[in-house]
Amino acid sequence: MKNTFSRLFGFGDKESEFELQDESHEEIDKKVYEEIQEIPIVNITPNRYQPRTVFDDARIEELALTIRTHGLIQPIVVRQYEDEKYEIIAGERRFRAATKLGWEKVPAIIKNLNDTETASVALIENLQREELTAIEEAVAYQKLIELHNLTQEALAQRLGKGQSTIANKLRLLKLPEEIKNALLEKSITERHARALIPLKNEELQLKVLQEIVEKQLNVKQTEERIAKLLEEAKPKRKAKQKAVSRDTRIAMNTIRQSLQMVADSGLNVNSEEEEFDEYYQITIQIPKKK
């Protein structure tokens, strides 16, 4: 049987970037010790690559009650990094619930994975659960891109998602920390946060964030507020304007569409349009690095 994470990220494969041939039982045995072991909780540490930064105490309590009643049906998965020291690969919520129950030991399966494999498994395992906040999801995408030296398009293909989905999530990472924290705490939604992106001024972004929270603005109200601010920020046009030729309009629209395509690819492009008596001026800033 093909390993899900290996198939996606090509661990140990030389022929194809992301396809892993069926392993023999001997090869699997070298990689995974399938027997369940009872490991002291004090010897286990959380995964350093865990994308989830907020754990719902109430949900952990519910899980603990379920485990108390029915037992831990699915062991956690760990890897050994020192003598009698283990790092969680998958199952941190179960680990936290067992800790809350006061268990001294927890059932675990030990896998031999390197740092890159451990990080990838932890990130993808959480992404597949679809319980991450938008910021946690964005962090997971960014880490996978860095770990495997992928483009946004390549990552999207491997995860079966649209490239625009990946790009939109990653844009959230460029927002101020206060806005990212509001997303983590679920004070605002992802659509609220994305609406704030066109406001390039951080002070203005934080001001609108405060309005959203204090006035409990919905997404439509937020977008209308931001549209008004953007309109107010535009340079005042002169009363008399010369007629714009059809060719000029086509040229301007083509440039705008091209800039939007570049932005959709994940590159943070800043542009500014100015209108003068005899010409339009478009200033474009393209970062050297993503």
From Swiss-Prot:
Keywords in alphabetical order: Cell cycle, Cell division, Cytoplasm, DNA-binding, Septation
Presence of keyword DNA-binding: yes
Pfam family, one: HTH_ParB
A GO molecular function held by the record: DNA binding
Disulfide-linked positions: none
Name of this protein: Nucleoid occlusion protein
GO CC, any one term: cytoplasm
Main location, first listed in the record: cytoplasm
Protein role: Effects nucleoid occlusion by binding relatively nonspecifically to DNA and preventing the assembly of the division machinery in the vicinity of the nucleoid, especially under conditions that disturb the cell cycle. It helps to coordinate cell division and chromosome segregation by preventing the formation of the Z ring through the nucleoid, which would cause chromosome breakage.
GO terms classed as biological process: chromosome segregation; division septum assembly; positive regulation of sporulation resulting in formation of a cellular spore
HAMAP family given in the database record: ParB_Noc
Gene that this sequence comes from: noc
Family: Belongs to the ParB family.
Keyword Cytoplasm listed: yes
Compartments in which it is found: Cytoplasm, Nucleoid
Organism: Bacillus cereus (strain AH187)
Xref: InterPro entries: Chromosome_partition/occlusion (IPR050336), HTH_ParB/Spo0J (IPR041468), Nucleoid_occlusion_protein (IPR023705), ParB/RepB/Spo0J (IPR004437), ParB/Sulfiredoxin_dom (IPR003115), ParB/Sulfiredoxin_sf (IPR036086)
